[in-house]
């Protein structure tokens, strides 16, 4: 998972060529439990780092998920809209949520590495 960056609000980000893929972490999906609904943003939406991107709803709770960086939504994962359990089964691949074209790519540097994120989780427990 060295290709991933993380937030303290349990989102992950993977850099691709000209966009980034965003989802919620395995830790977050474990805490939430079985997903039953995912609300995604619209393609073309402009978001700022930390702004709400959408909602994931599980049998336990509904939780907002946030933009790890500023950018424009270029794609949403329609598959998780139809089958929210993908977020539980494969949060880092098939269960991705949104793709963004970064407006300030330097914001990625401020995100957590896998090791930093694991330390953050350990402190929460």
UniProtKB/Swiss-Prot annotation:
Its cofactor is (R)-lipoate. The modification N6-lipoyllysine is found at residue 60. The glycine cleavage system catalyzes the degradation of glycine. The H protein shuttles the methylamine group of glycine from the P protein to the T protein. Coiled coil: none annotated. It comes from the Bacteria. GO terms for biological process: glycine decarboxylation via glycine cleavage system. Residues 19-101 form the Lipoyl-binding domain. Pfam families: GCV_H. The glycine cleavage system is composed of four proteins: P, T, L and H. This is Glycine cleavage system H protein. The keyword Ligase does not apply. Binds 1 lipoyl cofactor covalently. InterPro entries: 2-oxoA_DH_lipoyl-BS (IPR003016), Biotin_lipoyl (IPR000089), GCV_H (IPR002930), GCV_H/Fam206 (IPR033753), GCV_H_sub (IPR017453), Single_hybrid_motif (IPR011053). Keywords: Lipoyl. The keyword Plastid does not apply. GO terms for cellular component: cytosol; glycine cleavage complex. Belongs to the GcvH family. CDD domains: GCS_H.
């Amino acid at each position: 998972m060295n290709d991933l960056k993380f937030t303290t609000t349990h989102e992950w980000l993977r850099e691709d060529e000209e966009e980034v893929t965003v989802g919620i972490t395995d830790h977050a999906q474990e805490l939430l439990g079985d997903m039953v609904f995912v609300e995604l943003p619209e393609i073309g939406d402009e978001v700022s780092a930390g702004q709400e991107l959408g909602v994931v709803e599980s049998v336990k709770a509904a939780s907002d998920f946030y933009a790890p960086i500023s950018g424009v939504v270029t794609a949403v994962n329609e598959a998780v809209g139809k089958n929210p359990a993908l977020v539980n089964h494969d949060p880092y691949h098939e269960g991705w949520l949104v793709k963004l074209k970064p407006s300030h790519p330097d914001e990625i540097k401020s995100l957590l590495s896998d090791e930093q994120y694991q330390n953050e989780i350990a402190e929460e427990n």
